[in-house]
A protein has these predicted regions:
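Polysaccharide-binding surfaces and accessory modules of carbohydrate-active proteins
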Residues: 5-101, 124-156
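Substrate-binding groove/exosite segments of carbohydrate-active enzymes
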Residues: 151-211
Length: 211
C-alpha cells in the first residue's frame, strides 16, 4: 500500500513526493520504486531532447539534467533525488529520466521516504537545495509549514450558504486555485492557464484583494 502527498516548498524551487509505503502482506518484501520524468527544458520535446545532458552524482544522490544548447538557460539544472539511497538510474534514454530506490519491509511494517524534483541555477544553489532537503524530518517540517501557510491564508474569508458544495468551493478551493495557478505560477495540475495580459492580471489580483 502506497500513499503519496505532493507539495511545493514555500521558499525553494523544489517539489516533494512524500511517500508512505506499507507491506500489507504476511511475508517480508523487498520493493523497487522508480520515479521518472519526461524532461523538455525548451520550447518542445522534439527540438530539445537531443541537447539534454543527464548526469548522475553519487555524492548528491541525484541525477542532474541540463540543456547544454540553450544559451539563455545554460546554467539552469533540473534534478531528481530521494531521501533513500538511489540504487539505479536511467539517464541515457531520450524519452525519460528516472531514479530507483529499494526498500525492504517486514510484514505490516511501514516506512516513509520522499522523491524530490527541483531546479537550480548554478552548482552552488543546486548543492544547497539538494543537501537542505535530503532528510525526511526536514521534508516533514516543510510540509507542516506549507499546510499552516495555506490554512492561514485561505481561512481569511469564509462564506456559509445552504449549498454545501458551494461552500466547499468558495471556502478555500477557488481562492487557492487563483493564487497558486495565477499568481504563484502559470499552470496547475488540475487547471492549466494564467494569462500575462494586463486585464487578466488585474482580474486575478482583484479576487484576492481582501486576502
Amino acid at each position: 500500500d502506497l500513499e503519496t502527498i505532493q507539495f511545493v516548498s514555500k521558499i525553494d524551487k523544489i517539489k516533494f513526493y512524500k511517500n508512505k509505503l506499507t507491506n500489507v502482506t504476511d511475508k517480508k518484501k523487498k520493493y523497487k520504486i522508480s520515479f521518472w520524468i519526461n524532461p523538455t527544458l525548451g520550447p518542445n520535446e522534439e527540438k530539445s531532447s537531443r541537447y539534454l545532458l543527464s548526469e548522475y552524482f553519487e555524492n548528491l544522490n541525484a541525477i542532474v539534467i541540463r540543456n547544454v544548447y540553450n544559451i539563455d538557460f545554460s546554467g539552469v539544472s533540473v534534478f531528481l533525488s530521494s531521501t533513500l539511497p538511489i540504487s539505479n538510474v536511467s539517464i541515457d534514454r531520450i524519452i525519460y529520466k528516472s531514479i530507483t530506490v529499494e526498500i525492504e519491509l517486514e510484514p505490516n511494517e511501514t516506512k516513509e521516504f520522499s522523491f524530490m524534483l527541483g531546479t537550480a541555477i548554478g552548482k552552488e544553489e543546486l548543492n544547497k537545495i539538494i543537501f537542505n532537503y535530503n532528510q525526511d524530518k526536514v521534508i516533514d517540517k516543510e510540509y507542516q509549514d506549507v499546510v499552516k501557510y495555506w490554512d492561514n491564508m485561505l481561512n481569511t474569508i469564509k462564506v456559509k450558504t445552504p449549498d454545501i458544495n458551494f461552500n466547499y468551493m468558495m471556502n478555500g478551493w477557488y481562492l487557492y486555485q487563483t493564487i497558486a495557478s495565477r499568481l504563484f505560477a502559470r499552470a496547475g495540475f488540475y487547471q492549466v492557464g494564467g494569462a500575462y495580459g494586463f486585464r487578466d492580471q488585474l482580474q486575478d489580483s482583484m479576487n484576492i484583494c481582501e486576502v
